[in-house]
């Protein structure tokens, strides 16, 4: 303590107060890019001038995004911590400009290679760019990539390559074997080695990544851009591999591995980045309209495809594993979405073919408003605006009593649930092609007698629905014509009894009604695309489906139960 003028003790200087200490404790307050808070002194002005004049090359766009996502400050922080934050922010300000400034200056937030993109934009916007690579299989990812930080996501792709490199024989790519990462045991699941080791064609466009066998045009996977959440490749430790995480109905969320020898991995990952940037520009030119979702109905069944990463536990009888949402008749439900999504935490490919591209969020497209859904025969309608050409899908054996009570008591139109109306996975499973082939061989039909489109059906060019004719079904004793659910259930006496009926509410919808464990089941036989199918097998007609399961004694697997066809409930003459 020192003596001031007049002998009085001068007060001690107050400890410096951090900026966070002056703010109330409101965790929802968040300041983007604290490094941009410049001081008033000449030193700060020199720093700002240096940042504008001499940007440091080689810093990936990921740093700019992470700089804009500083952690929330919920409590006063000490001065040293603030100094570290201020120092890191200054480095970010010198090295990478703001993401918004980057978009204004260059028209994109992904750093292009020094020589520009490899392909013309018109080609990526149109037919796309194809590469011949080696498919290594995929490994299930049990956690949402959005819930993981960037380093963990990178480790997930590395660990997936590490596992498949040993499991797939004849690999030629350069890879240094590493010990299994036990920390990722709860994130990575089982592997799927079907088609592993095959030479395939990967087509990259603004629509997504399409994997197919060149010789037969068989579709292995078709991942839309909205379903791809992370991509990585061309690193120094994985120069011959590209890994990306995407969702599809067969593998759910999985990490797919492509082996690209002779430096092709960098070209592939660069083309993916170019396609994503062009898709994002399309999104900016046609942003979605905000739609106020209706109130969720209480006591009714939830949507089968859920919101975002969360899906309902109910299964469709004739859907593939993964709860593929129905298309709602002839109307493509991908053209409408109930809520716009924010594109956040976007990473870049880095300067000169950087290996990482992160967090490709869903790009919602809204092509029309949603409407009201009228009640219909105990089925949940997939698209409120679709024509009633096919009966709505039924949740099998879930809340059956509630559905019956609703059919008897509800007289007012129901409101649609606030579930998204876009199909994130626009692909029919590649297993369908094999099942169709096996089923044709079992029926004595050679592949040569079938049209090429039926030998290997292509997901985007599936033929239009062709409903069975009434004359064909009238020849079958188990067909009862137009009949309600309640009337059909009264005809069932024992387990295994079954009949086929035409829906009263939606003529042209054919439903299999059977008894299992004392409970009636109603199974939709024709999917929205006009294909007669079960969860595993495609059939030529409803008669083919019934005869196949009746003569072979095979059950129809519906959700987590089985429906056996033993006793035909014949119609009255």
Curated annotation (Swiss-Prot):
Protein source organism: Rattus norvegicus
| Keyword Phosphoprotein among record annotations | yes
The free-text domain note is: The PID domain mediates binding to the TrkA receptor.
| UniProt-listed PROSITE patterns | PID, SH2
Ranges of residues in domain PID: 125-307
One protein family per Pfam: SH2
Q: Where do the SH2 domain residues begin and end? A: 478-569
Q: What is a GO molecular function of this protein?
A: receptor tyrosine kinase binding
Chain's role: Signaling adapter that couples activated growth factor receptors to signaling pathway in neurons. Involved in the signal transduction pathways of neurotrophin-activated Trk receptors in cortical neurons.
Q: For this entry, list what GO says about its biological process.
A: cell surface receptor protein tyrosine kinase signaling pathway; intracellular signal transduction
Subunit structure, as described in the record: Interacts with the Trk receptors in a phosphotyrosine-dependent manner and MEGF12. Once activated, binds to GRB2.
What GO CC annotations are associated with the protein?
plasma membrane
Supply the name of the protein. SHC-transforming protein 2
Post-translational note: Phosphorylated on tyrosine by the Trk receptors.
Please provide the record's keywords in A-Z order: Phosphoprotein, SH2 domain
Q: SUPFAM superfamilies attached here?
A: PH domain-like (SSF50729), SH2 domain (SSF55550)
The gene it comes from is Shc2
Q: Per its UniProt record, what SMART domains does this chain match?
A: PTB, SH2
